[in-house]
C-alpha cells in the first residue's frame, strides 16, 4: 500500500473517525485505524469499538492499493505534529512508513484481516435534514441525558416521528427536555428509537460542516450519512417511559422573565448554595417580581429581586440551581415559566415558542 495526501485532509479524516476507536479494549485491533487505499484515488479510514463504527472516504494520490491497520492514537499524534505539506504513507505486512518533507516515522501495524467488517445497514426508514437543525435540537436535549449507566434507557435520546412530526426527548428522571424539529416527515410511518446520547452529540458535531445529513433506521442500528462519512450506532434496547403523561395540560401561575437577567441572578445567588441546597424562588403577583434566594447552614445566604410578569397568584418553589441553568441555556431572550404548585413539576419554554420545552421537578423547601 502506498499513497500521498495533504496533511490537512488526512488530519481532518482522522479526527472524524477517532470517536469510533476503542480507547480501553482487550482487543488491540479495536485501538487501530483501518487504512484502505483503493485504486481510483480513494483512501478509506474505518474505526469501530463494536458499538459504533465510522467510515470516512477521502481523495488521495494512490500509487499502490492495499490495506493496513495503524495504531490510532499514535497515528493521529504523528499527523498532527507534521508540517502542513504532503504526507506519504507506505505499508507492508509488518510495518508502515509515514513521511513528510524531512521527517520519517516507522510504525508497527496489525493485520487488516482481523479488523471487524463495517456493518452494512439496510435501513427501513430514512429521514434527511440540515445538520444545523439537528445540532441545535440535540444541543438542547443533551443536558438532560442521564449519565447513570445502570439505567441505560435514560442515557439515550428518544428520536420519534408521530403524525409526520419529528421530536427529540431526553430525561434523567429529574428533568425532561423536548425539542420539536421543523422537518417534514410526510410519508414516514410513526416510529421511535432510542439513540445513545453521546453518539448523537458526536454525530451532530461531526456533521456541522455538511449541507445535509440522512438518518436511517434498521432493527437494532442507526446509520448517519453526511458528506463522505458514514456513522453506524447501535440502538438502546428497551421501552422509553411515556413522557407525555408527565407534561401538564394546565397551570396555576404563569411567569414571563428576561432570560439573561434570570440566569445572572441564579448564578450570583447560587454561590451560597451547595450542590444539594435548593434555590428558592418566590413569585409575587402584586409586585410583579421574583426573589431568588439561597442559604447554607454555617456559610450564609444570598437573595436578589428581579422584575417578572406574574399571573395567577403568588407561589414559592425550590429547584436545583444547576438544572435551572441547564434549561435556561437553551431558551430565547424571554422565558415563560408555568407552575402548578410548589411540589409539582414546572415547565420552562421560550416566549418565542421555538418548539423546545423543559420540565423540571421541584425540591422541597
List where the protein language model places each region.
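Structural preference for solvent-exposed beta-strand-turn elements
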Residues: 1-365
Amino acid at each position: 500500500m502506498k499513497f500521498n495526501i495533504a496533511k490537512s485532509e488526512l488530519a481532518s479524516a482522522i479526527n472524524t473517525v477517532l470517536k469510533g476507536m476503542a480507547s480501553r479494549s482487550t482487543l488491540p485491533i479495536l485501538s487501530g485505524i483501518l487504512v484502505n487505499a483503493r485504486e481510483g484515488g480513494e483512501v478509506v479510514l474505518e474505526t469501530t469499538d463494536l458499538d459504533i463504527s465510522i467510515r470516512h472516504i477521502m481523495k488521495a494520490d494512490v500509487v499502490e492499493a492495499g490495506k493496513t491497520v495503524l495504531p490510532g492514537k499514535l497515528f493521529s499524534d504523528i499527523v498532527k505534529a507534521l508540517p502542513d505539506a504532503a504526507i506519504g504513507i507506505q505499508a507492508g505486512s509488518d510495518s508502515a512508513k509515514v513521511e513528510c518533507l524531512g521527517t520519517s516515522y516507522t510504525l508497527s501495524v496489525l493485520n487488516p484481516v482481523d479488523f471487524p467488517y463495517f456493518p452494512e445497514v439496510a435501513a427501513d426508514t430514512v429521514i434527511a435534514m440540515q445538520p444545523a437543525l439537528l445540532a441545535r435540537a440535540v444541543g438542547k436535549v443533551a443536558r438532560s441525558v442521564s449519565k447513570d449507566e445502570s439505567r441505560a434507557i435514560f442515557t439515550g435520546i428518544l428520536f420519534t416521528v408521530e403524525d409526520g412530526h419529528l421530536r427529540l426527548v431526553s430525561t434523567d428522571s429529574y428533568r425532561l427536555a423536548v425539542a420539536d424539529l421543523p422537518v417534514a416527515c410526510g410519508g414516514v410511518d410513526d416510529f421511535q428509537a432510542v439513540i445513545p446520547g453521546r453518539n448523537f452529540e458526536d454525530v451532530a458535531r461531526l456533521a456541522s460542516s455538511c449541507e445535509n445529513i440522512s438518518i436511517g433506521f434498521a432493527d437494532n442500528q442507526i446509520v448517519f450519512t453526511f458528506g463522505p462519512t458514514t456513522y453506524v450506532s447501535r440502538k438502546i434496547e428497551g421501552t422509553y417511559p411515556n413522557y407525555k403523561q408527565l407534561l401538564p395540560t394546565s397551570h396555576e401561575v404563569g411567569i414571563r422573565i428576561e432570560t439573561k437577567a434570570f440566569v445572572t441572578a441564579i448564578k450570583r445567588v447560587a454561590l451560597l448554595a451547595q450542590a444539594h441546597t435548593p434555590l428558592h424562588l418566590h413569585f409575587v403577583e402584586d409586585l410583579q417580581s421574583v426573589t431568588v434566594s439561597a442559604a447554607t447552614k454555617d456559610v450564609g445566604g444570598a437573595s436578589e429581586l428581579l422584575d417578572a410578569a406574574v399571573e395567577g397568584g403568588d407561589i414559592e418553589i425550590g429547584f436545583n440551581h444547576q438544572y435551572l441553568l441547564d434549561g435556561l441555556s437553551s431558551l430565547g431572550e424571554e422565558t415563560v415559566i408555568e407552575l402548578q404548585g410548589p411540589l409539582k413539576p414546572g415547565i420552562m419554554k421560550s416566549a418565542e415558542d421555538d418548539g423546545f420545552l423543559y420540565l423540571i421537578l421541584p425540591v422541597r423547601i
